[in-house]
A protein has these predicted regions:
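Conserved acidic segment of CheY-like receiver
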Residues: 3-31, 40, 60, 271
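Short acidic, S/G/P-rich loop/turn micro-motifs used as interaction or catalytic elements
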Residues: 13-22, 64-77, 104-107, 333-337
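Short beta-alpha junction loops
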Residues: 13-15, 100-108, 127-128, 360-369
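Short helix-loop-beta junction
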Residues: 26-37, 226-227, 275-277
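Conserved PLP-enzyme active-site core in the AAT-like
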Residues: 41-44, 49-53, 74, 87, ...
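Long, structured ligand/cofactor-binding scaffold of large enzymes
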Residues: 182-279
């Protein structure tokens, strides 16, 4: 199919009637005559914003004017602008073609750091516009073909082929929908391409998901390389299924298994299905309802053996000789708490054969140095001597996968290689023979998007946006002052004023830098108690917003604003959050986040504060809620908040829920 990737030309004479303008427009017209779109601009404008076009452009043509050059090219405004623009583009995109277009200047007039990033140097009036256009288009086409990962490229080729389909699915490339009025709506909503690409495993050129061959197998191997794994298996029905695959491959009835008690339901289902006998590692929890990490001491081999001895279901087992088959850890928690996986590997290597990190919420961490060793598999890390490492990741949660896109990553140990045939038996057990190819394509594309430098830039943008949001929230709080109220964002007290924060600020510890409790016994910001040095950190892209009314010790204030009312208010005003607690709600800064989105959230929180302070009637500020719950329509917003807050305080719900959990 024809994609819209214009060739971007930046020339201050693009719209002028002088010879330079006539020359560059002649090239643009020749490019358009070949079927490519041209986007012309006369200035670089905001360099960083214009460079965002790198994701939409098939090539850049940057004009340099002779009169702009003066002695000392490193200081010339033309060179400075050129260098800045190229750096911005290359920060995200190492491959998009960049051409320089000029009258008499040659490569000897430009510094080498600029030259090495160029695909060509075009001289005005030397070659015909048609030849120049063909030369640029050749590289543009090569670039667009080169960025297509294996399976997505094969799927595009198949959809373009126009073959008649005599296999399932029954809608036959969407044709069946065209025979019904409601089907017409469905077809128009999803579009031709999605339906033409919805095929079955009879299409040999696409490969077989269940056999991991052909284009699909090539894509899985490519993803394994990008994610620092030895093996990758795409999963089309979510990480719930990925977890079950790992367990059915590694665990047999009666096996002892070590499990994070803060595990996903799929792990509990895996325990039931495999007939394993679990011992649980107990996490912490603060009174905001935020589940914290498991203490490092619980990962000690002797601590695990003590749990085995204490388990009545394992009374027949010799705790000193039995080896648990698998350890499964939620990495990260829903709220963003991470573990130093290298420390865990060192502690358990050889004692537990299979180390499984459920990284449903952490597929992005491998692509930015901010996360250090706080994710399962990283570049240039020593692999365990005996234990095989598994990571199950939800590509759809924080990367650019569509819903249910997941993958299993496996890293061999030094002396144990994954038995792929045996693993595939578990894979077959949990996979459909009719997988959704759009999900496979999104796994393939999501992996390609994370290839550095693009992936690193995407994650860095997420981190920067989350930090800027936190800074903006603190600024609002400071301006309101101590006599007024505002929402807080849970996280470290120290925050750098600009840029990427120091990762050490996000490591969970007591106030003391050595991880030692302060002499006054005061907890640090997380309230999870003593933390082993360097063992846990908070992912900054996971933001928990705290509403007034409850402190970190579980004590209720005289007034309060339950989070459930805030999030219902936000939903009515076009802001939908990830989850809601008693006095907190949770948002994520994924790679799809924008400044407009988080600034809109902040302004809606301002609007809530105004309505709360004025005690606006519910029928006015939350009409949809009142339509379903007319009992509250005559109440004021502040009155309703106080009513629910009083009930929470009366029954001490924060302490009660913590006690129930622990």
């Amino acid at each position: 199919m024809k994609f819209r990737f214009p060739i971007v030309i930046i020339d201050e004479d693009f719209r002028s009637d002088n010879s330079s303008g006539l020359g560059i427009r002649a090239v643009a017209e020749a490019i358009e005559a070949e079927g490519f779109e041209v986007l012309g601009a006369t200035t670089y404008g905001d360099l960083s914003q214009f460079a965002q076009q790198q994701s939409r452009a098939s090539a850049f043509v940057l004009s340099i004017d002779d009169e702009e050059f003066t002695p000392g090219p490193d200081l010339d405004p033309a060179v400075v602008n050129l260098r800045s623009f190229i750096e911005e583009v290359r920060w995200k995109n190492a491959d998009v073609p960049i051409y320089i277009y000029g009258e008499t200047k040659t490569s000897r007039h430009l510094p080498n750091d600029i030259l090495r990033e160029l695909h060509g140097f075009i001289h005005m009036f030397e070659d015909t516009p048609d030849f120049v256009a063909k030369h640029i288009i050749r590289d543009a086409k090569k670039y667009l073909e080169g960025i297509q990962p294996p399976f997505f490229k094969a799927l595009l080729d198949y959809a373009e082929d126009g073959s008649y389909s005599w296999h399932c699915p029954g809608h036959s490339g969407g044709v069946a929908f065209l025979k019904s009025p409601i089907g017409q709506m469905y077809h128009q909503f999803y579009g031709e391409n999605m339906l033409r690409a919805d095929v079955c495993n009879s299409v040999e050129e696409l490969g077989q998901l269940l056999d991991h061959n052909g284009a699909i197998g090539e894509s899985e191997r490519n993803a394994a390389r990008i994610f620092n794994a030895d093996h990758c298996f795409f999963v089309t029905n979510g990480t719930s299924t990925s977890n079950k695959m790992v367990w059915h491959h590694t665990v047999a009835p009666g096996d002892v298994v070590v499990v994070d008690r803060n595990c996903h339901k799929s792990i509990l289902h895996s325990i039931i299905m495999t007939g394993a006998i679990p011992v649980f590692m107990k996490p912490t929890r603060n009174h905001y309802g935020i589940i914290g990490p498991i203490q490092k001491s619980e990962f000690e081999i002797e601590a695990i053996r003590a749990k085995i001895r204490a388990n009545p279901l394992l009374s027949h087992v010799d705790a000193d000789t039995v080896k648990p088959r698998i350890m499964t850890l939620t990495q990260s928690t829903y709220d963003g708490v991470l573990y130093n996986t290298e420390t865990i590997k060192e502690m358990l290597d050889g004692y537990i054969d299979n180390l499984h990190f459920d990284e449903a919420w952490l597929p992005h961490a491998a692509f930015h140095p901010f996360y250090g060793k706080f994710h399962a598999m990283g570049r240039k890390r020593a692999r365990p001597a005996r234990s095989v490492t598994y990571s199950t990741q939800s590509i759809h949660k924080l990367l650019a996968g569509i819903s249910q896109a997941s993958q299993v990553l496996v890293q061999d140990s030094q002396d144990t290689k994954l038995d792929r045939h045996l693993f595939n038996e578990a894979y077959l057990m949990h996979s459909s023979t009719s997988p959704q190819y759009s999900i496979i394509a999104s796994c393939d594309v999501a992996a390609a998007m994370m290839e550095p430098p693009g992936g690193t830039a995407l994650v860095e943008e997420s981190i920067l946006e989350s930090l800027d949001f936190r800074r903006a929230m603190r600024k609002v709080d400071e301006e309101y002052g101590a006599d007024d109220w505002w929402f807080q964002v849970w996280g470290p007290d120290e925050l750098d004023e600009e840029g990427i924060d120091n990762p050490q600020n996000w490591v969970l510890k007591r106030t003391d830098a050595e991880g030692v409790q302060r002499s006054d016994g005061e907890d640090s910001w997380h309230a999870f108690g003593d933390m082993a040095r360097g063992f846990n950190m908070l992912d900054p892209i996971k933001a928990t917003i705290i509403t007034p009314g409850l402190d970190i010790d579980g004590k209720f204030g005289e007034t309060g604003i339950p989070a459930s009312i805030v999030t219902k208010y936000l939903a009515e005003h076009g802001v939908v959050v990830e989850k809601t607690g008693l006095y907190s709600f949770f948002i994520m800064f994924t790679i799809g986040i924008t400044k407009g989105r988080w600034n809109s959230l902040l302004t809606e929180l301002q609007q809530f504060k105004d309505d709360y302070d004025r005690n606006q009637p519910m029928w006015r500020c939350m009409p949809e809620f009142c339509e379903k719950q007319p009992l509250y329509e005559k109440m004021g917003l502040r009155d309703l908040c106080q009513h629910v807050h009083t009930l929470y305080a009366k029954y001490d719900v924060a302490i009660l829920s913590t006690d129930m959990y622990l």
